[in-house]
């Protein structure tokens, strides 16, 4: 029997996506920001089908949960469609932006789309005819958009085929010429539908319906410890392209005969066939064109300059004097880039060590590391090639860095390195000094513009000595190194969190105040949940801000009545992790890369670091 204070993780995740949908419906948000929230919702749901749904229908005891999940997804999809059709499109029209769907085109726009189709779109079109032979094999690419087409020739003969919509090659939405003060936008889906007569000139009629297939992109390497792990990952990445289907999305207008045809041709199960709208992949709305209406978007907030880094020529001079804490994107991420760029050319820098989990495709940091190696610095980079959906990008940069002479340490068996840390060694006049950067977020200058994270620079030995031990572990795989100041998953992180909650419990039992605050992205670890319930029953004040999955339900008498749980969904993606313990008034604050998820605490290397400077502590 499930515990009444536990909420299924799949439904919790969907509740987060529902919050995103609420932002899309919130008219206090600018119109194009609401369109962006629809794109986020669509992207999130697409990932849900790629990595989470397969387990539900493969485990018999989860069949009831599978039904609840489908019911919630259907509810959200109906809400999504209503927001798009009844709110967004009419409000676009109010702002003189016409989105073409089923309406007739103006003559000028007919000429434009004909030209664009013939010169550009048509070069990508591939036709696959469907036969009645059940032994014939057909393959739909994962997440690719297609049109399933019913053709009828002059003799009344009917054939079926499907063609690709090249949204992976071209912008999904095209801005057409303005007419009489109005702007016009059309999707390439609609352009193709209106130009089918160019593809099938001998057919009397043609009717097209949107289809799309999601495939399971979870992969499991049975034995990570033996053989070459990187080679195994590369093989799995190839296999992922042809993973089993998890969702076949089709236009709700599609006739039953065509649905049956799809089921047979693509070997689909009933539960995989899901009714959708006339268009799929709404995450392409990220690039929905804005003709020139800045007031329909959020006002631009340029990041603040950080004065201490502006007053000295060398960033190391500033860090050497005092610890420095930055909050992104409110403060500029350029200082992180400056840290690595200056290290690459600084005459005193002899060695650089860094962990890379998710880096940008055009990474300035990776390029700085390459320059450092070519400038004679000793550079060691731990590259996590098991970072989901970033495996290929990480492998690419690992190869580029290796070619430049950088020592690359790859993923470890049965363990992910999720820590975001760097350690630099400087030597001058016979003296050696280390500088460290620790962060809650990835070394990624692109996501740093939209994710809230903290970055901490220090040269204090209590931090740098512990980081030396962490990097030594990456090299030797041994854990017999003392780590005292940092909390490191796999070493002492979980134990320290449990111990500090125990201290708050003890303080309350001694008549003092006890309080725990955590801002995290997920909570499902059973030991942490049990300890929070114990603290709840001891009357410890517990406040949690959990962006994503949270399997703990607040307000359950006898378990969580003293626990407050909030979720923040807003302009920026909340990504930072903060642990705060009242500690009888001498509060302790840790920033971390780790959520309170079992995978973070038990199967990853994470680093939490204390913020001891009172100037960086917010008031109650």
Q: Model segments located where?
A:
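Hydrophobic alpha/beta core scaffold segments
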Residues: 541-545
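N-terminal localization/anchoring segments of enzymes in phospholipid and broader phosphate metabolism
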Residues: 1-514, 534-538, 550-620
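Glycine/threonine-rich ATP-lid/beta-loop region of ATP-binding domains
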Residues: 526-529, 533
